[in-house]
């Protein structure tokens, strides 16, 4: 089967500031209707990369194709950008801000749709400087959608938000993706990447060091999930299971690609599961395996 044409294709992207290589030989393909996450610690090159993709900065070298053609000046008219740092005018209300952007870039008939999509209804008469961090981000997301973009850029969309606001924003972004929009985001949150992204490109020191779906990367670099049982379990019963297990110093570890099926198999053997725990790897563990450092270094 022929691979579908990517909506955005980047080859050998490089950005140098005097003696500093901020982006080093980055190549990416982003397919329509998917979410790609650039994941990495501060200073990894994520923001510089996305700003080049947004056409804010020119690359030192490399090519960028949009819908199969070299990126042109009209590119900005077809994309939406939610910046990491808000630049809202304090004295305007949410309604005034959204109306202004729609007047400049959008369709007045889209106002109600954007208000509903980004859950802004109760905030319309509130001034921008009275909004919480999560409310500001929802307004910024609505502004990024004003021109009905086919491609949306989100730079650290949930940084600084409390857990509930972060989860609410993710649900809105996930719904936007479900409507067929293509999303590229930067994040240093492995939870955000696992929740939103179909593909992630893990960056470190300006380079992509791993790329793929979160599930595939976790399996490739960290192996299976594991069920942990106390040493009191009768290991003779485990001999009949088609799973790799090992007795460690203070526990028994059973590796499995399907945790729920394994638990069901243990139950049929009348193994006491009251002391069971589950160890699951995540993208933080992948980054640690690749670099020896934590994502939040």
Each predicted region: which residue ranges?
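Catalytic Walker B motif of ABC-type/P-loop ATPase nucleotide-binding domains
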Residues: 152-156
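Conserved ABC transporter NBD signature motif
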Residues: 62-75
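Short, charged/small-residue-rich alpha-helical element at the C-terminal edge
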Residues: 223-297
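Conserved ABC ATPase "signature" region
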Residues: 99, 103, 108-123
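Conserved catalytic motifs of ABC-family nucleotide-binding domains
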Residues: 148
């Amino acid at each position: 089967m022929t691979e579908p044409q990517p909506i955005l294709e980047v080859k050998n992207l490089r950005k140098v500031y005097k003696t500093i290589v901020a982006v080093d030989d980055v190549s990416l393909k982003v397919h329509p209707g998917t979410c790609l996450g650039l994941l990495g610690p501060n200073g990894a090159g994520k923001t510089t990369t996305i700003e080049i993709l947004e056409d804010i900065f020119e690359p030192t070298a490399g090519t960028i194709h949009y819908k199969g053609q070299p990126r042109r000046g009209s590119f900005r008219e077809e994309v939406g950008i939610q910046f990491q740092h808000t630049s809202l005018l304090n004295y305007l209300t949410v309604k005034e801000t959204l109306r202004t952007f729609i007047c400049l870039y959008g369709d007045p008939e889209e106002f109600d749709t954007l208000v509903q999509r980004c859950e802004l209804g109760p905030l319309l008469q509130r001034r921008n400087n009275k909004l919480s961090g999560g409310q500001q981000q929802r307004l910024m997301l609505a502004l990024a959608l004003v021109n009905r973009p086919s491609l949306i850029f989100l730079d650290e969309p949930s940084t600084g938000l409390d857990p509930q606001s972060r989860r609410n924003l993710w649900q809105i972004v996930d719904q936007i993706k479900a409507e067929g929009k293509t999303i590229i985001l930067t994040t240093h949150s492995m939870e955000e990447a696992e929740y939103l992204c179909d593909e992630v490109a893990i960056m470190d020191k300006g380079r992509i060091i791993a790329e793929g779906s979160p599930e595939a990367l976790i399996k490739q670099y960290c192996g299976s999930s594991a069920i942990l049982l106390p040493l009191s379990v009768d290991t003779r019963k485990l001999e009949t299971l088609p799973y790799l297990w090992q007795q460690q110093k203070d526990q028994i570890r059973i590796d499995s690609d399907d945790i729920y099926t394994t638990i069901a198999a243990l139950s049929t053997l009348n193994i006491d599961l009251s002391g069971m725990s589950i160890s699951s790897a995540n993208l933080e563990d992948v980054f640690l395996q690749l670099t020896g450092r934590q994502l939040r270094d």
